[in-house]
Amino acid sequence: ATGESGVWMHYRKGLRDPQTGNYSVQLWRQRRWANNKGPIDIQDAGVRVFAFRERVMGGTPYRVVNPESIVEITDTAQVEVWEGSTTPIAQRIRVHGTGHADLGDRNRVFVVQSYRTPEMDYFSPKALPYLQQLVDKYAEAGVQLNALYSDEMHIQQDWSYFQHHDNGEFALRYVSPGLAKAYADQFGAEYSDFAKYL
């Protein structure tokens, strides 16, 4: 492959007391996935925390967050591992903290646990030449390919799809440097860091 990869970002929303800045959010930190390459051990790539306020859009069931009001408060975060809950594939963690009471009415937090995996950066300038070389190897070996198919780009994630849900939602997104650069080039520099936009 290209030797480049991104990170999987696992997210969970929680409550924050705007008076004290107290928050506490639990989630299952992933430890091992199994996919087309076999089992892989997931590497912890850190936790980030953002404070925000969501507002109800009148007359609709939707909530909205002003992206400019999202503030990173990772410096307040502590991660507690519940050792008794650790299994080969996951462990329960609590991300909690206090502080930044000066942030006004921001009464929610967004916790992002990142993981390193060997998945390729599909948006890297090296990706297309690598894939062309791979197809050429098949042709040189006498294998004629009429088409290539994949029902999901991220076949390198995990086959246990429903173990990655929080509150009924698939709570993981793959972000690579190449993807972030493509978005930033097209939509603005603020998209060079995707974590708060998940």
Language model feature labels by segment:
Residues 145-149:
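Structural preference for beta-strand elements that scaffold enzyme active sites
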Residues 160-161, 165:
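Extended, H/D-rich, highly charged conserved domains that either
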Residues 140-142:
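Alpha-helix termination/capping residues and helix-transition junctions
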Residues 129-138:
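Short alpha-helical segments and helix-capping/turn motifs at coil-helix boundaries
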Residues 168-198:
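Active-site-proximal, well-structured secondary-structure segments within enzyme catalytic domains
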Residues 152:
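Residues that line or immediately flank small-molecule/substrate-binding pockets and catalytic motifs
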Residues 1-98, 102-104, 111-128, 155:
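Acidic/aromatic-lined carbohydrate-recognition and catalytic surfaces
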